[in-house]
């Protein structure tokens, strides 16, 4: 018997840990008060030459969003780092921001300690754990975020905290107004995508049904890489479904050649409502090429949103809903991550 996405009682039995409630809460994070660091960030201000945002998993996803959003506003180079070793440029002129919701991420802790040895200015972000203790030992600022169901469900809290860190370090202007505007658009998306909205009016339920039984291949413009990567990760963690992503225009110079056969692949192109003429040309050429070569019919995900932050958060929220509905269609509780936990246990031996 297939799952009825309009049967709230049936869906609640599948979503035993209530991941849907965590997704519903996402807009509220950007409407509420912002957590300020326990130690003044005046202590880390200096003439920075670079910024490194360190994280893994859901914590790194927050860093991805922050850089896609604020990279153009930052006066110095910045990158997201995802391994324990550090690049050679990290030194005393680097602002090193470690994001770890659990505070126990081994790669993040190792990189944080190495950054300390190199004299970098340090900031920690998370919900306690060893990172908070290390920040206390190092007398480094620490921003504590609110509790959440899982690290990936703390995306909003981590984005806000990272933006606050950059503000307090005098690298960007206040982002509170832009967050409030983005929250208003997120509330509208929640209204359309929440579990009570019927399938015929719910774009997230419709997309989940289209994805069921397929291997999603995701594409987005380079400036929206955080959205594509987040959706790929949410399909893995929530839907327990393999997917991949690539970015344009780069994908038009290599990956497009692989679309001679469709197999069970379903291309999904993530777009926004404010593309330039050049961007529209890139997306149109790519879509037409893979469609004609593979006879596939790419899905397009486009959310009307204004503002640099809204253009990222709006599709992220929509696609987070999709990943939970797809898990329900597959009769899978979205929350447990047994293989991730097994991997971490093996790494700790």
Predicted regions mapped to residue ranges:
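Generic N-terminal amphipathic, Lys/Arg-enriched alpha-helix
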Residues: 3-29
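A generic structural motif
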Residues: 80-83, 241-252, 296-306
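Short, small/acidic-rich helices and loops at N termini and domain boundaries
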Residues: 333-349
């Amino acid at each position: 018997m297939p799952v009825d996405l309009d049967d709230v009682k049936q869906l609640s039995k599948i979503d035993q840990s209530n991941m849907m409630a965590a997704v519903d809460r996402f807009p509220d994070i950007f409407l509420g008060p912002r957590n300020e660091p326990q130690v003044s960030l005046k202590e880390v201000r200096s003439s920075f030459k670079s910024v490194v945002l360190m994280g893994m998993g859901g914590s790194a996803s927050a860093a991805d969003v922050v850089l896609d959003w604020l990279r153009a506003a930052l006066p110095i180079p910045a990158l997201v780092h995802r391994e324990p070793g550090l690049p050679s440029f990290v030194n005393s002129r680097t602002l090193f921001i470690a994001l770890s919701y659990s505070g126990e991420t081994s790669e993040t802790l190792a990189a944080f300690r190495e950054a300390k040895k190199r004299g970098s200015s340090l900031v920690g972000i998370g919900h306690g754990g060893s990172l908070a203790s290390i920040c206390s030992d190092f007398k480094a600022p620490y921003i504590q975020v609110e509790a959440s169901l899982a690290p990936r469900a703390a995306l909003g809290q981590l984005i806000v905290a990272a933006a606050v860190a950059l503000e307090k370090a005098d690298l960007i202007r206040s982002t509170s107004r832009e967050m409030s505007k983005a929250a208003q658009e997120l509330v509208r998306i929640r209204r359309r995508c929440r579990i009570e909205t019927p399938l015929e009016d719910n774009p997230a339920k419709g997309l989940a049904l289209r994805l069921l039984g397929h291997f999603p291949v995701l594409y987005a413009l380079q400036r929206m890489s955080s959205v594509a990567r987040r959706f790929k990760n949410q399909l893995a963690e929530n839907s327990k479904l393999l997917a991949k992503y690539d970015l344009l225009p780069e994908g038009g110079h290599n990956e497009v050649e692989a679309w001679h056969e469709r197999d069970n692949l379903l291309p999904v192109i993530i777009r926004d409502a404010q593309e330039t003429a050049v961007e529209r040309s890139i997306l149109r050429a790519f879509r037409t090429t893979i469609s004609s070569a593979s006879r596939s019919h790419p899905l397009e995900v486009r959310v009307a949103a204004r503002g640099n932050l809204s253009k990222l958060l709006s599709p992220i929220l929509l696609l987070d809903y999709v990943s939970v509905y797809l898990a329900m269609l597959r009769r899978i509780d979205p929350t447990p991550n047994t293989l991730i936990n097994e991997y971490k246990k093996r790494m700790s031996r």
